[in-house]
């Protein structure tokens, strides 16, 4: 029977990040295929295609994009792998950010034809702030791509991280035939077995005469020159990888499966076991026997048959046991975590035990908030909070059918508690007519879709001219008596805090100037 140390040591928990359409969800599918978690992979797009395993919400299946973060666990090669498949669409940075807080490393998927794109830069910066290992998979080598060396140089120039090519592509587009493994000094030649099945593989040495028959003399000579050029460059440095200053680069095609298995094997070999975490009581060692975890995501209605709400927890230390008693630090109460389960998109499996590095979902009757800490009784430390992004777009929202007020209030409360949207109301009023704030406008579409499909409520929505939110930190009197200007509005959040929405920076200056004693805090303070 494996010891606690051995179980934690074999955990690998990572997030996959990319710009939209770089192939991130397809790569996730192929990891599951090679890991044996699914028998046959489905592509994300195409009218006749199978819906992607990691895309569970109906709107995701319709649009072919990931709009929530999926959590998937599977076993492969002695490792227990937890994949956090993050939203690639630019509008979903908030959910993505929280997911990255739960990862020990990140896989950055880059389109070989397009290189580093805006969303890639944004997500990379979040990873870099945490100094976690970042691996690069240059995808779509089965299409015409840019020069591989040029792509590596662009990653270094645009993202400020060194790179080391772990393998090197042989051809591109229709001529993409395989990769050269620099460590093992051999060619991995691929044959197409159909996109849904594992690619056929032949391994052959660079000096084997049979190689010419496989790839041709010219391509063999070009490869030898490229390998020599790579040899004159940077050395591989494992410590630099672990510190997040050197990114190992792999090439392949998630669609055809070429290069996926070498990448998965190399990644698992190089990346880290669960990392230690900062708390207000110091560093918490992942290998400590005492259980601890934090809530990084809340999701309602993952399965319409259940009509439930799950809190996703990243276990940071020790071992979780189903029937044990735990302590909710923010709630200041002991509890047993109900219906603990691991995920494969919307598929669930009840777990009896889990270890540091694992992600578990527990039934949440409404007591958890994002960022909450759970420990063993007697421990009261807190992990660092997970900030929310300041909403940049606002809409006035109300139900078209006033008879569905109860369903409307339930829906907005549950979806708001998930953190993807912010809900505000007018002071001294109920939630029949609310203001919804989001980071990106696509979240309005998802919100409207979910309210109709999950709660049976059609919405009346109208855009509002606000751009900023400020928290009232100090006010000499009743906030309703403040001198407001055009383009500003007093609001209240779920916690009862008073905020002011502004149409621009000028409005902020006007209010502070004409209301002596008024002190406003920015959104970073609000979110703590």
Language-model features: where?
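Structural and coupling elements of P-loop NTPases
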Residues: 1-528
């Amino acid at each position: 029977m494996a010891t606690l140390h051995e179980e934690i040591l074999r955990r690998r928990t990572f997030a996959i990040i990319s710009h939209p359409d770089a192939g991130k969800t397809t790569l996730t599918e192929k990891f599951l295929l090679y890991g044996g978690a699914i028998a046959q992979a489905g592509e994300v797009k195409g009218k006749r295609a199978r819906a992607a395993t990691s895309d569970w919400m109906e709107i995701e299946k319709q649009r072919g994009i990931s709009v929530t973060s999926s959590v998937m666990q599977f076993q492969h090669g002695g490792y227990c792998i937890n994949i956090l498949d993050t939203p690639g669409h630019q509008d979903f940075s908030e959910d993505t950010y929280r997911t990255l807080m739960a990862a020990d490393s990140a896989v950055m998927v880059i389109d070989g034809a397009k290189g580093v794109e805006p969303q890639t830069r944004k997500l990379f910066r979040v990873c870099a702030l945490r100094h976690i290992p970042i691996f690069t998979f240059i995808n779509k080598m089965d299409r015409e791509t840019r020069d591989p060396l040029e792509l590596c140089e662009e990653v270094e120039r645009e993202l400020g991280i060194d790179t080391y090519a772990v393998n090197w592509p042989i051809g591109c587009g229709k001529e993409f035939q395989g990769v050269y493994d620099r460590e093992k000094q051999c060619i991995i030649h691929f044959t197409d077995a159909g996109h849904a099945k594992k690619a056929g593989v032949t391994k052959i040495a660079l000096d084997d005469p049979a190689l010419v028959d496989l790839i041709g003399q010219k391509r063999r000579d070009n490869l030898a020159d490229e390998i020599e050029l790579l040899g004159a460059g940077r050395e591989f440095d494992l410590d630099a990888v672990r510190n997040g200053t050197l990114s190992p680069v792999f090439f392949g095609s998630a669609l055809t499966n070429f290069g996926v298995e070498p990448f998965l094997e190399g990644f698992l070999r190089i990346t880290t076991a669960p990392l230690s975490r900062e708390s207000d009581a110091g560093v918490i060692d992942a290998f400590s026997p005492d259980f601890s975890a934090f809530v990084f995501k809340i999701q309602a209605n993952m399965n319409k048959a259940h009509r439930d709400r799950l809190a996703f927890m990243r276990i940071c230390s020790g071992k979780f046991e189903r029937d044990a008693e735990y302590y909710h630090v923010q709630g200041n109460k002991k509890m047993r975590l109900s219906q603990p389960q691991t995920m494969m998109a919307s598929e669930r499996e009840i777990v009896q035990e889990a270890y540091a590095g694992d992600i578990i979902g527990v039934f949440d009757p409404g007591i958890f908030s994002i960022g909450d800490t759970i420990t063993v009784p007697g421990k009261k430390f807190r992990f660092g909070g997970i900030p929310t992004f300041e909403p940049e777009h606002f809409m006035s929202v109300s139900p078209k059918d006033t008879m569905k007020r109860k369903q409307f209030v339930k829906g907005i409360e549950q979806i708001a508690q998930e953190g993807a949207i912010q809900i505000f109301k007018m002071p001294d009023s109920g939630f029949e007519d609310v203001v919804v704030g989001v980071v990106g406008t696509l979240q309005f579409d998802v919100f409207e879709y979910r309210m109709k499909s999950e709660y049976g409520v059609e919405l009346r929505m109208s855009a509002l001219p606000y751009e900023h939110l400020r928290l009232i930190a100090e006010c000499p009197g009743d906030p309703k008596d403040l001198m407001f200007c055009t383009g500003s509005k007093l609001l209240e959040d779920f916690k009862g805090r008073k905020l002011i929405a502004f149409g621009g920076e000028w409005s902020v200056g006007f209010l502070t100037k004409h209301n002596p004693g008024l002190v406003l805090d920015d959104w970073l303070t609000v979110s703590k």
